[in-house]
Amino acid sequence: VGLPNKINNDILLDIIRQNKIPIISPLGLDKNNQTHNINGDTAAMAVAKSVKSRRLLLMTNVDGVLNKEKKLIDEISSSEILEMVKDETITEGMIPKINACLDAVNNGVTAAGIINGTKQHSCLWEIFSDKGSGTLIRK
């Protein structure tokens, strides 16, 4: 598994200027042209930072970040997230998503959302409604 260190913004922005949506595979090449798999959340975060996105959305099969009572947290700050990781409220598969979101919001992305990709219209609700559909993470 590799980590991204450079994103080719020119290609991405050219596709976006054509009113198309770029589809990005989380694969990367090293200096020896060896192919490496990159965690999809990490790749999405790197792209969001590189193109200076306002929002990063990561999808999962749960509604978002849950508190100790397993209730959805609508919005949370970076410091609150770190406390939840420390006290092990957030564990396992959510950790890479949380790390990607924190990296994004600490490096120029205004907010990051973790939403349930199995729910119909979750992206639209997250983007176009006041309440959203998952957890919004801000700096």
Language model features by range: what are they?
Residues 1-139:
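C-terminal catalytic "cap/lid" subdomain
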